[in-house]
């Protein structure tokens, strides 16, 4: 495991330069179409950019063109699930949210790193931007049963500013009988260039998925039904 972690950090340190230069195994998830994701897509739209609505700062004004994908004028589209499954994986993307908005990226569809307008907040929990989302119960009503894992610091930018998230995720390990012998891990996560998680074990999945069976591989999921969010330059690379 130590050798794997060392390799992961070497990959991570060079990863973004590679993503922006040579392909080096990186897969572009948001190109000219959404073919990397399972249908249906709902109200996802390709645009040139977004800006805050001066009259309604919880909404975006979209600019015609290409290069950015957002979840439509209502801020409520289908969650995206990747066609490809991943085990150990590295992801880089840029995101933009208006005031009060909420999204997230889930590894294996189970382990969520939160995307939220947490600009200026001092007392952080896993429900804040970059946090590892709290576990939750659905009944009798949706409620958190813990605080999740807070980011090490608040690196969240102001609503309307483009932000970057870089994550190295290591899948759980299982023996020949299928018994888990190693927890999943966020080997490293960086929000806007600042380390927010380092070698953070994930004892269970997050949110209401925490009781679900864990897997060697699973899809990436992008949450799109909790308010406006825009993405660009989303790239993923499997770690061998």
Language-model segments: what does each one mean?
Residues 4-13:
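Sec-dependent N-terminal signal peptides
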Residues 19-240:
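Carbohydrate-interacting regions of secretory-pathway proteins
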């Amino acid at each position: 495991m130590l050798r794997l972690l060392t390799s992961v950090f070497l990959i991570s340190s060079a990863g973004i330069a590679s993503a922006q230069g040579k392909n080096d195994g990186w897969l572009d998830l948001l190109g000219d179409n959404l073919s990397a994701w399972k249908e249906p897509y709902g109200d996802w739209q390709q645009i040139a950019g977004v800006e805050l609505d001066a009259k309604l700062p919880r909404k975006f004004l979209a600019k015609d063109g290409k290069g950015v994908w957002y979840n439509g004028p209502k801020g409520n589209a289908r969650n995206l699930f990747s066609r490809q499954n991943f085990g150990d994986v590295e992801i880089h993307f840029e995101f933009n949210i208006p005031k009060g908005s909420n999204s997230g990226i889930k590894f294996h569809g189970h382990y969520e790193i939160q995307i939220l307008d947490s600009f200026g907040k001092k007392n952080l929990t896993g429900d804040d931007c970059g946090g590892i989302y709290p576990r939750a119960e659905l009944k009798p009503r949706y409620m958190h049963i813990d605080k999740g894992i807070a980011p090490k610091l608040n690196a969240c930018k102001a609503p309307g500013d483009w932000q970057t998230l870089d994550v190295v995720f290591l899948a759980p390990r299982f023996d020949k009988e299928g018994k888990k012998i190693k927890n999943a891990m966020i080997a490293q996560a960086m929000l806007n260039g600042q380390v927010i998680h380092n070698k953070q074990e994930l004892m269970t999945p997050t949110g209401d998925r925490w009781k679900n069976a864990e897997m060697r591989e699973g899809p990436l999921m992008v949450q799109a039904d909790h308010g406006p969010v825009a993405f660009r330059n989303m790239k993923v690379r499997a770690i061998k």
